[in-house]
Amino acid sequence: MLKTEELQINIGPQHPSTHGVFRMLVTVDGETLVDLKPVFGYLHRNHEQLGEVNTYLQNMPFTDRLDYFNSMVNNHAYARAVETLAGVEVPERAQYIRVIMDELSRILNHATAMGFMLGDMGAWQTALLWGMREREKILDMFEYVSGARMMCNYCRFGGVVRDIDDWFITELKKLMQGLPHYFDDFEGLLLNSEILLARARNIGVLPKELALAYSVTGPVLRGSGVAYDIRKAEPYAVYDRFKFKVPVGTVGDVYDRFLVRIAEMRESYKILEQAIEQLPDATGGFINPKVKQQSLKAPAGEAYARVESPKGELGFYLVSDGSGSAYRYKVRAPSFINLSSLADMCKGYSIADVVVILGSIDIVMGEVDR
């Protein structure tokens, strides 16, 4: 009788498929994966401890460095937590501006994430280059309003640092004219791709029950058939004024997570259309002038605020002792939580599938390790 022996191998911490310094200790029997242990910590930067030393405002640019693809969303979530804690009101126009930036970030994130995932599958780079083309247009707009392409540091307590003007609105409308063609081309090229179907269908299945048990969120949860989106379940900013759907999958495999992200880009487009149409004039201002940004002190208490980031639920938990810094500062990072389900997604599949499954979760190590 033929006997096989299990073998332990390391993938990472420096490996092109891990998209950052992340190590997987993998146990295989032949080419079949038996066990997987994720090893974190290579990018630890003491983020939460620094958040308890910095003033509230000083901590804003540090949030840019969590999910560095989505600094606008990070800023929004942190600003909401401080505003909740300090009882700060946000002008209506600023709420709309934040939503516009968040939805542009969602399109940017999903376009590049799916491009990278197809590269991991051994497909081609065309999809990634298409995504990068749209990403460049969005980053140019971010640079115009914030002065930076990626580390935007754009939100302030009670609003945003700079208003959007006619040029921005014109460029946004130009971008949106081309987005439907990009979505159609992307879908038409890829959904019938033999490489995508072979490498994604019935691979990395995460059943609904396991998804809920692991508390995963975002496209990973919705890909498993759970129609949960914070923008619908607990509307913040002005999301309750927009009509949009929550796309879900049926199987919970890599392919479903791919489809959910494509559908979410279309829903973000719908939200942007409505936001432009409803955007209030500049009369109410883009920031609350009563807020003392540099010397802000929150009354003693605690607050938790969350947003639907492109990767899932991004939350900030703050405890105040009445001083100008947080007594306790905690980040609920979706990449970290979603990554906890990786082992169950991978068991029983080929070691070659691990790279694809990891890519379908869409992690950024900046918010995994912190």
UniProtKB/Swiss-Prot annotation:
* Cited Gene3D superfamilies: Cytochrome-c3 Hydrogenase, chain B
**MF annotations from Gene Ontology:** NAD binding; NADH:ubiquinone reductase (non-electrogenic) activity; quinone binding
Q: What is its EC number?
A: 7.1.1.-
Translocase found in the keyword field: yes
* Keyword Membrane set for record: yes
Reaction catalysed by this enzyme: a quinone + NADH + 5 H(+)(in) = a quinol + NAD(+) + 4 H(+)(out)
Signal peptide span per the entry? none
Q: Which domain of life is it from?
A: Bacteria
InterPro entries the UniProt entry points to: NADH_Q_OxRdtase_suD, NDH1_su_D/H, NiFe-Hase_large
In which compartments does the protein localize? Cell membrane
Keyword entries, A-Z: Cell membrane, Membrane, NAD, Quinone, Translocase, Transport, Ubiquinone
Its Gene Ontology cellular component terms are: plasma membrane
Q: What does this protein do?
A: NDH-1 shuttles electrons from NADH, via FMN and iron-sulfur (Fe-S) centers, to quinones in the respiratory chain. The immediate electron acceptor for the enzyme in this species is believed to be ubiquinone. Couples the redox reaction to proton translocation (for every two electrons transferred, four hydrogen ions are translocated across the cytoplasmic membrane), and thus conserves the redox energy in a proton gradient.
Q: How does it assemble?
A: NDH-1 is composed of 14 different subunits. Subunits NuoB, C, D, E, F, and G constitute the peripheral sector of the complex.
The family assignment reads: Belongs to the complex I 49 kDa subunit family.
Question: Any idea what this protein is called?
Answer: NADH-quinone oxidoreductase subunit D 2
- Organism, scientific name: Herpetosiphon aurantiacus (strain ATCC 23779 / DSM 785 / 114-95)
State the gene name recorded for this protein: nuoD2
